[in-house]
Amino acid sequence: MDFGITFPSYIRAYHDVKMAEEYGFTHAWFYDSQMCYSDVYATMALAAEHSRYIKLGTLVSILGNRIAPVTAHSIATINELAPGRVILGVGSGFT
């Protein structure tokens, strides 16, 4: 059985992701709320560097806030740090 946990995208969330991984969580999800938290992709990159197996995903990346190539490049970069552990959740946001 898989268990996920959601975090606000604050830059030090990698500490919490590392702890979640130690407690057996399989997924860590991050809000993409640019006005409230740090950048979701910077947060995920740090989490990728400080974890080993937990999957990392956006919950959700708001398509209207960034042009598609920027989103694709950001998520591809994180996938280089954590191959096969990255999930891009997309949506309109604010729902």
Place the predicted regions along the sequence by residue.
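Flexible, glycine-rich active-site loops centered on histidine and acidic residues
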Residues: 1-8, 65-95
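Generic preference for flexible, low-structure residues
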Residues: 19, 41-46, 63, 70-72, ...
